[in-house]
């Protein structure tokens, strides 16, 4: 089970790296790539959700297993309640308002769910909306930039250069491993961060193999262009 993910962890360990791998089903056919985690480095959210991600996966293979359940209390992070294969289970499929209601997803996860529901059942008019956030069972999600921040607005030149270097480092180890090139569909929901991938076919193939690539902006709000991509995505997923 999840042999390619286990091999990725071993390869990264041999490189002395413990990056954020991602969340979701490691054997899924869909990969969604966001920009970066929004919890600032060193914050409580970063310490609970982002920084331990490598070790959470590693411990799963070392005996913890891959079971998950609904947390007894909101934000219950004990292993088995919070698990990277299906984190934050079980969230209601209603977007958080400015009040940040517990038990509801962020805007980004809400729109990830809409996208996956559309892929599963039809188009933006006819798709069936899931009752809870369950897109993780049909996709794996990760980030392109390992520097966590709420957004990338107002950054100065040195900060932009740090982001570019972070992405280059991720590209480097991705080239040397064989996990992220296994997916049939890769949705690059990271806007301008994906420009180098869009322009360079060799880089694109090195990172994502022969996957069908879809580009859109970061999904903290809906991207209407995705509605035209649904038939293409469904066709790619149907291929053997």
Which residues are covered by each model-predicted region?
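C-terminal capping/extension of enzyme domains
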Residues: 1-12, 97-98, 156-178, 192-240
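Short, solvent-exposed loop/turn segments at secondary-structure junctions
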Residues: 36-40, 145-149, 191-196, 218-222
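Short, Asp-centered acidic motifs that coordinate Mg2+ and/or phosphate
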Residues: 185
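A polyanion-binding, active-site-adjacent surface
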Residues: 1-181
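Redox-cofactor binding/interface segments in oxidoreductases and associated redox assembly factors
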Residues: 188
């Amino acid at each position: 089970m999840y042999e390619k993910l286990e091999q990725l962890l071993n390869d990264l360990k041999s490189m002395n790296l413990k990056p954020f791998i991602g969340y979701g089903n490691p054997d899924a056919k869909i990969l969604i790539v966001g920009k970066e985690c929004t919890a600032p480095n060193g914050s409580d959210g970063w310490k609970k959700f982002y920084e331990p991600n490598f070790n959470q996966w590693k411990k799963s293979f070392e005996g913890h297993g891959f079971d998950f359940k609904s947390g007894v209390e909101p934000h219950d992070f004990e292993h088995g309640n919070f698990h990277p294969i299906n984190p934050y289970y079980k969230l209601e499929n209603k977007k958080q308002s400015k009040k940040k209601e517990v038990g509801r997803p962020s805007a980004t996860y809400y729109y990830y769910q809409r996208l996956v529901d559309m892929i599963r059942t039809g188009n933006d008019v006819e798709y069936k909306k899931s009752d809870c956030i369950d897109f993780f069972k049909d996709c794996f999600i990760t980030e392109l930039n390992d520097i966590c921040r709420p957004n990338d607005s107002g950054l100065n030149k040195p900060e932009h250069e740090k982001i570019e270097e972070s992405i280059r480092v991720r590209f480097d180890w991705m080239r040397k491993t064989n996990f992220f090139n296994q997916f049939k569909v890769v949705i690059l929901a990271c806007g301008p961060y994906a420009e180098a991938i869009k322009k360079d076919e060799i880089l694109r193939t090195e990172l994502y193999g022969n996957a069908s690539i879809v580009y859109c902006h970061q999904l903290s709000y809906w991207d209407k262009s995705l509605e035209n991509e649904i038939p293409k995505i469904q066709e790619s997923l149907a291929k053997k």
